[in-house]
């Protein structure tokens, strides 16, 4: 089994798109023995882009997961079963080298598969509108960056929290 992708990410007027992180995230949810990912930083005539909230990962995940859904539909395979069969798990080596520790992807997929919302058939609507159900997997690094906050318990029992993070 193999995976291949060519990614071209808009950098704006200067180099520095999230091309590398997109390449590392593209197939990160899947265990496959062979792969090739070419990722390009495309400089264009407009303002510089900058990282915000998992740069490159959503774009790569959308592309890969869309193709996975198309494969499942053409092959008549349940999307969660396909993902479970090919899921990265503890011990899986990513294409760029690191080996996963416990990541919980299989457990999440199994929980989704067994949930009533997934088991319930999607009925046709009397008003002619179409309904569906989607499944996707995604990945981002746990880099262990340090953050902090200052918590103050006030005399009246209220608590104040000050942090430099938007989260």
Pin down the residues of each PLM region:
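Gly/Pro-rich active-site capping loops and adjacent beta-alpha segments
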Residues: 1-60, 126-167
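Acidic/polar loop patches that form or flank catalytic/metal-binding clefts of enzymes
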Residues: 1-3, 79-80, 119-122
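N-terminal leader/propeptide and maturation segments of large enzyme subunits in energy/redox metabolism
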Residues: 51-118
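Intrinsic disorder at enzyme termini
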Residues: 94, 107-126, 150-154, 158-162
């Amino acid at each position: 089994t193999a995976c291949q992708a060519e990614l071209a990410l808009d950098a704006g007027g200067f180099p520095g798109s999230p091309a590398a992180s997109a390449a590392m995230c593209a197939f990160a949810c899947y265990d496959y023995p062979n792969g090739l990912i070419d990722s390009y930083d495309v400089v264009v005539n407009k303002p510089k882009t900058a990282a915000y909230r998992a740069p490159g990962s959503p774009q790569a995940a959308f592309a890969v997961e869309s193709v996975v859904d198309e494969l499942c539909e053409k092959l008549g395979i349940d999307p969660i079963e396909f993902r479970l069969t090919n899921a990265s798990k503890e011990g899986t080596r990513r294409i760029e080298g690191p080996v996963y520790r416990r990541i919980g992807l299989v457990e999440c997929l199994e929980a989704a598969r067994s949930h009533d919302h997934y088991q319930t058939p999607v009925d046709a609507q009397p008003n002619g509108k179409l309904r569906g159900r989607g499944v996707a997997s995604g990945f981002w690094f746990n880099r262990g960056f340090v953050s902090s906050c200052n918590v103050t318990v006030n005399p009246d029992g209220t608590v104040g929290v000050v942090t430099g993070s938007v989260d």
